[in-house]
Amino acid sequence: MTDTRQDPIDSLVVADFGRGISRAYLLESISGGFRFVAKAEHRTTTDLPYEDMSQGWYNLLRQLEWSSGRGLTVRDKLAMPQLASGDGVDGLLISASFGEPIRVAILEAGQSAVAGPVLDALRRVHTRVFHASAPSSRKDGGWAATQADALRSFQPEMALLIIGAGAQDAMPRLLQLAKQVGMIGTVSRAIVIADGQAQEQGVAALGNKLKVRSISPVVRAPADIAGEIERELGEGFQIRLRTSDFEVIADDAIQAPISRAHAVDLVNRFIARAFKRQVLTIGVDDGAHAHWASGDQGAISALPQVDLTTAITGLTSREVSDATCWLPFESTEDELVTWALNRSIRPWTIAEQPRDLAIEQALARQVARRAVSEIGRTQPMALAGVDLVIGGPVFARWNQPGAAALALLDSIDIVPNNGVVDLALDPDGLMAVAGVVGTIDPTLASSLFEYDALTHLGSAIVIGGATSPGDVACRGEIHFDNGEMAQFSVLSGSVEVVPLKSGESATIVLRPERKFSIGGHPAGKTVTLAEERRIVGGTVGVIIDARPRTLAGNANRAMQVRQWLESVNGIRASTAVRKQS
């Protein structure tokens, strides 16, 4: 690797290599801030007919040169450091998600403080996880056989046995499954995290064909154990990236590449700390990942086996069937399955026709909902506290801010504790870029994020409760800074958008009907959003959402979805008309 770091760094190229699409970003210090200057995007050329990633990389560099009007390369390599003429850059940083994820099986028995930190660590590196917890009930006699079949299908490369307190009744099943691990043939190494006799039994069950080591949770802290496993898998990720064509590129980088999901997670946690927000970021790009953070706490859900491109076939039949509930027209599960199979054959096709856009948006909801549900499973109280939801580039590529806002709302599908959630997009994927930059200079990353990263869509006020569709759910009024005001009403089962432009702020008074409530407030209680809870405008405006929080369809479901989309996309006129108060 090339150490091109200077003090200060005035310019960088950050490369983000994906399975199908790669991007390059030119960043530069401008007027005291570190800014996003240009972006290039091109197919990752690892597959036929090229089978050489450097071909796509050269194309990205040429795009950046054309966009920025400056020379960045010498003989198809980045010119570093930056010259006095302004040509070249001071360094190269890389994030990547194109390698196959490492498949890890976690077999657990009893209660261990190690399990949670280890699972969090695995989500920060490029892995797929098979997690099985052995039951202690005598009625689960077929558990080991069922899990063994699933394990053979998963074909793990690494196994972790975690044995905690109270594991006596579950141990026979765990050991039976551990013996199968040793016989699968794909596992090369294993770690037994246990103490005393349980540790000895776990090592013996895995057999002598594997490279097995043991760690005592009594001697070492859970965070220390998780950190060691994360480092080991991170090194495995680096090895998996070391193809000859990629090494030619990576040798010029300041440091080793990091995974895209980890880079985004670093920025998600920064937002929570710096702006005192409870934030959820959702990405559907080379797999799905959701990131939650609040204060110093955080969680990540990484699902590299499902997305909207090559891994669209990772959707279950139930998820595809449920996707029909998000369509503004009648369709069947078979039609969506056919669409998904066609997408898997042509994974980099851009949806342009209204029908294709609607189907992609519906399936994006299902992918996102699975990733978000993993956060809800590991952090049961987290989602209700979220006050900021950020969507990745896939939500922005539809060029329909209203549809993107609605998709984000449907992905979390909760009534937030305070009734309000802000919605934003990361249209250019700059959260991953800022995360990579932050590993060498947090100040530069902070500047990049605050100036260029997010597009604010607006705020959504979610009304809880339900009656017959068409009944009034809430009445209210919005008071603008310029003295104007508007009154509005929202019907049960509908969405209303109150115009509030970017840069504007307003006070909103909400008067829900007696069977409806705003957040955690009692049903029928008037709520005023003012001062620190004042609403700030965005690209879409203020969304008042009085829809039921359920996927249950009805005969008029497609018509309802069409009306929702027309409201958020500005096709259906708002009932709120601004006038002088």
List each model region and its residues.
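Phosphate/pyrophosphate-binding loops at sites that engage ATP/ADP/AMP, CoA/4′-phosphopantetheine
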Residues: 63-85, 151, 182-186, 271-272, ...
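N-terminal phosphate-binding loop and adjacent alpha-helix
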Residues: 40-68, 136-143, 166-167, 314-316
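Short beta-strand-loop/turn "lid" adjacent to the catalytic site in phosphate-handling enzymes
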Residues: 75-115, 395-399
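Terminal amphipathic helices with adjacent charged low-complexity linkers/tails
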Residues: 192-227
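Gly/Thr-rich phosphate-binding beta-strand-loop-beta motif of the actin/hexokinase/Hsp70
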Residues: 3-32, 102-107, 122, 148-166, ...
